[in-house]
Amino acid sequence: MNKTDTLILEGGALRGVYTSGVLDALMELGIRIPNVVGVSAGSLNALSYLSRQPGRSRDINLNYVNDPRYMGPSHLLKTFSFFNFDFVFGELSHELVPFDYETFYKSEQSMWAVATDCRTGKAIFYHDKEMGEEFFTACRASCSMPLLCSMVKVGEDVCLDGGIASCIPLPEELPFPAGKLVVVLTRQKGFRKKGQGPAIDQMYRRRDRKS
């Protein structure tokens, strides 16, 4: 396991609780994989892995899942976003379940958050070492699911959830030599996504016109 070069974390909204358990186990064993790629919810889990805070991601999802400040239809109606990322990266990370920014910034591990460029439809890999505080905006973009969230501007890019363009990045997609990979999935073996149907297509078109 110590020879692993890259860890890829699939998204999956609240299914990411499984991922947080895997990362907690790695932290408890003292295993620090050099390169970490997070897609959607995987990027939020990756943050606590680099800040070396076992249990943090789990506690957030279990303790705040029913908190309307965190997510919910009322927030969707008010802001066009089901998830309240201002709360996640604000009060939650600074006061309620503090994020260890100092350890994160000093980490020798590298992290990439995957988002989808709304102009090109291609995946963008944002690197924590190159962005400073704006990297957290990239993580927000990585988690912004279409229809349920508004588009997020990262620099000059306009982005949505990374899972649209690259739900599980292939080695050749990565902006660095991947080496030996470990991929944490949040779907069962053999899962195949079904078509979304005409009703969902119509909802997307309506949302696009509003945007």
Regions found by a protein language model. Give the residues of each.
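Patatin-like phospholipase
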Residues: 1-39, 47-210
